[in-house]
Amino acid sequence: MNKTVETFDPKQTTTLETPAKTLAAEAKASDGTIQGNRIGFVSLGCPKNLVDSERILTQLRIDGYEVTNSYDNADLVIVNTCGFIDAAVEESLDAVREALEENGKVIVTGCLGAKENQIREVHPDVLEITGPHSYEAVLNHVHKYVPKPEHNPFTSLIPQTGVKLTPKHYAYLKISEGCDNRCTFCIIPALRGDLDSRGVGSVLDEAKRLVESGVQEILVVSQDTSAYGKDKDGRTDFWNGMPVKQDITSLARQLGKMGAWVRLHYVYPYPWVDDLIPLMAEGLILPYLDLPLQHASPRVLKMMKRPGRVDRQLDAIKKWREICPDLVIRSTFIVGFPGETEEDFEMLLDFLREARLDRVGCFKYSEVDGAVANTLAELISEEVKEDRYERFMEVQAEISAERLARLVGRELDILIDDVDEEGAIGRSYADAPEIDGMVFINGETELTPGDMVRARIVASDEHDLWAELVALED
């Protein structure tokens, strides 16, 4: 069961489960049908890394390679790594070790690939290492060790949207790379560089292809979604002969006209986030805001190099909910940041009680190699971190239960993700895949993943909802 308040677990929070399941299913379905050389593939990390994996896999298929999730019958294995926090680094290094032991020929890419010396020190036998979004370099390395098949009669079978590691009814849409912020606990700019926004026409073209292929939910991701277009100085681009400004509000407005759910992730709390709320109230995009706030103590926020006016944030949340009463706010916070005092932590709890956020992730501070925060102040003991985490979770669990209870009795659109012998499992507008809760519709075994249904909410807890089917929508 997915949780509203979660601790850090690489299998849940850093590495999504769905891509591995999808890759395994596709490999099984195509096993032996493509007479080309086989490439094993492991995709770790967040949705942004998942999109990188999809691009590499698409080009591999175009080049005639068969992709498999099995090491022993692959000619080579690619491991797309995560390097965000130390637990993710350990998971990535373990995956490389397993690939070397099972196969012996391994190419490493992704965020951890930006730290080649660290990988070579542990795994000197790795063939090649590239950093994140190095698609061309990865393919060139593959061609070097496993020559490209001369003929691939199956190229025409590759969907227009490319290979996807998500179910057919939802997809991640990455709108930019890198980040211009310098949060002291984060090393993403060192791994992925400064902000580099895609052209708005390119983004909208991809979104249109996704919707035309049957995607019903577009999850917009980047390192800093609300900063989209800042590096382009808000210049106007053109799409379908129409001028569109390169900023997140203009992009969201156009995405909202395509007829799919549009969900925004990783929205940094800039002032212009205010402009997105009316789009949610109008129903153009989902009234769901993934807004990582990280803390509520002005002193800690200053050490983090994050926006520090908590009173302004509370005022903003109040104003947003007045404009869009159905708004669901997800956020993440760090407890046990170096130098965090009991007073700082109590400020965080007070903020939770006043803000009444819907979905919250809590992370115990983890030392990240190269992060400035490690040297700012005395590190907090693991015992204190655990105590603060448990107290945080206890407070937020009660709030989450209260926020979900308000949905009981309402009819909501539910997007079905899975069906088993007990019934259907889906998500409402309040639930992003894998990180939020689920909606259980017991007894409805005739539904299909990708169905959009109308359901009446009959029960809730602090994480999930239970519903009764009202109607199957077109």
Swiss-Prot record:
Q: Which UniProt keywords apply?
A: 4Fe-4S, Cytoplasm, Iron, Iron-sulfur, Metal-binding, S-adenosyl-L-methionine, Transferase
SMART domains reported in the protein's UniProt record:
Elp3
Q: What class of enzyme is it?
A: transferase
Q: Which residues bind [4Fe-4S] cluster 1?
A: C46, C82, C111
List where in the cell it is found. Answer: Cytoplasm
Kindly list the biological process annotations in GO that this record carries: tRNA modification
Choose one Gene Ontology CC annotation of this protein and give it.
Answer: cytosol
Pfam families listed in its UniProt record? Radical_SAM, TRAM_2, UPF0004
Instruction: Tell me where in this chain the MTTase N-terminal domain is found.
Output: 37-147
User: Which intervals hold domain TRAM?
Assistant: 405-471
Q: Give the matching PANTHER family.
A: RIBOSOMAL PROTEIN S12 METHYLTHIOTRANSFERASE RIMO (PTHR43837), RIBOSOMAL PROTEIN US12 METHYLTHIOTRANSFERASE RIMO (PTHR43837:SF1)
Q: Briefly, what is this protein's role?
A: Catalyzes the methylthiolation of an aspartic acid residue of ribosomal protein uS12.
UniProt-listed HAMAP family: MTTase_RimO
Protein name stated in the entry: Ribosomal protein uS12 methylthiotransferase RimO
Q: Which organism is it from?
A: Shewanella amazonensis (strain ATCC BAA-1098 / SB2B)
What taxonomic classification does the UniProt entry list for its organism?
Bacteria, Pseudomonadati, Pseudomonadota, Gammaproteobacteria, Alteromonadales
